[in-house]
From Swiss-Prot:
InterPro entries: ExoRNase_PH_dom1 (IPR001247), ExoRNase_PH_dom2 (IPR015847), ExoRNase_PH_dom2_sf (IPR036345), Exosome_comp_Rrp42_subfam (IPR050590), PNPase/RNase_PH_dom_sf (IPR027408), Ribosomal_Su5_D2-typ_SF (IPR020568), Rrp42_archaea (IPR020869)
Organism taxonomic ancestry: Archaea, Thermoproteota, Thermoprotei, Sulfolobales, Sulfolobaceae
Species whose genome carries this gene: Sulfurisphaera tokodaii (strain DSM 16993 / JCM 10545 / NBRC 100140 / 7) (Sulfolobus tokodaii)
The protein's name: Exosome complex component Rrp42
Compartments in which it is found: Cytoplasm
Annotated family: Belongs to the RNase PH family. Rrp42 subfamily.
Listed NCBIfam families: PRK04282.1-1
Amino acid sequence: MSITPSNQNITSLLKKESILNALERGIRLDGRKNSDYRPISVTLNYAKKAEGSALVKLGDTMVLAGVKLEEEEPFPDTPNQGNLVVNVELLPLAYETFEPGPPDENAIELARVVDRSLRDSKAVDLSKLVIIPGKKVWTAWVDVYVLDYGGNVLDACTLAAVAALYNTKLPKVEIEGDNVKIIKEEKTDVTPIAYPVVTVTVAKIGKYLVVDPSLDEESIADVKISFSYVQDGRIVGMQKSNFGSLSLQEVDVAESLARSASQKLFEELKKQINM
């Protein structure tokens, strides 16, 4: 049976009431505490043809990130740096309202936040992507595909991108003068990422703040705020979404929840990579 807009509004109201009733009892509908993540798994080298890849499952959300390297000329203003390009695609199979075609504003915003977290944190060492200074560099294309949308896709996208970059080994390069020979079959031990960065999203539902909102929680959230961290606890990015508001006190509480929850993401990365 199709759901009409009026029925959908009733459904949302009933859903919100159930979620709020659970939060009043100190628990969420799926049994988590407000500060808990859903089950997380990270699988490296999932796409064998990519230079590096990672599949991340976060509850019902599933995201695949792949890295491809292309030999290019550097930008004139950064002759001693390679390039980083992040794309996010919300595949039609991931959710019923996602449509084929060019990335929409949601995918573009996701890509922008992931890219900014990697750049502003200096986690990606662009100097490692230099082949010949001023002449040849690598462009690292980080393509992130949302395969199943089960809520809180941003945290999964950042985690997948970071894991895929750790899984990437630069190919061997032989240089004679201005001649460059790329030996893609032989990998070095050099990765383009220096240290990990994670993103933690907190949603405000009524008067409650919850980490890692599920799809149901996300659909009735008043506002979401996301924090990006490096391992030493520095905040390297922050993003607010939805039209609701947060008081300064709520931002402080949300940041405290996010900071604590970030350790769970770092622990999951440690299981797969050397940090």
